[in-house]
Curated annotation (Swiss-Prot):
<feature type="transmembrane region" description="Helical">
    <location>
        <begin position="63"/>
        <end position="83"/>
    </location>
</feature>
<keyword id="KW-0256">Endoplasmic reticulum</keyword>
<protein>
    <recommendedName>
        <fullName>Serine palmitoyltransferase-regulating protein TSC3</fullName>
    </recommendedName>
</protein>
<keyword id="KW-0812">Transmembrane</keyword>
<comment type="function">
    <text>Stimulates the activity of serine palmitoyltransferase (SPT), and thus plays a role in the biosynthesis of sphingolipids.</text>
</comment>
<keyword id="KW-1133">Transmembrane helix</keyword>
<dbReference type="GO" id="GO:0005789">
    <property type="term" value="C:endoplasmic reticulum membrane"/>
</dbReference>
<keyword id="KW-0472">Membrane</keyword>
Length: 84
């Protein structure tokens, strides 16, 4: 039950420490949070780690182009499916 409690920042009567909950404490475990975490992890893997540590510039360019084409076509297909 304690994990479901919404934490509010508060100030103790003594001292100047202000309690701030962690992201894990604030998490509700919904589908929106899982999707946001997936996108954030994908960003870190794709944009940060691969181009700088594992690839040459031509490999990074090809992967970047393919990734953007796939994402763009997927988004277009999803929007077309929803609205038509």
């Amino acid at each position: 039950m304690a994990a479901e409690k919404i934490y509010e920042p508060y100030k103790k009567s003594r001292g100047t420490m202000i309690y701030t909950p962690t992201n894990q404490q604030m998490s509700r475990g919904g589908i929106g949070e899982k999707l946001a975490d997936f996108v954030k992890n994908l960003y870190w893997v794709y944009y940060i780690h691969l181009p700088f540590y594992l690839m040459t510039s031509l490999d990074a360019f090809c992967l970047h182009t393919i990734f953007l084409v796939v994402v763009s076509l997927s988004l277009f297909g999803l929007l077309k499916y929803i609205f038509l």
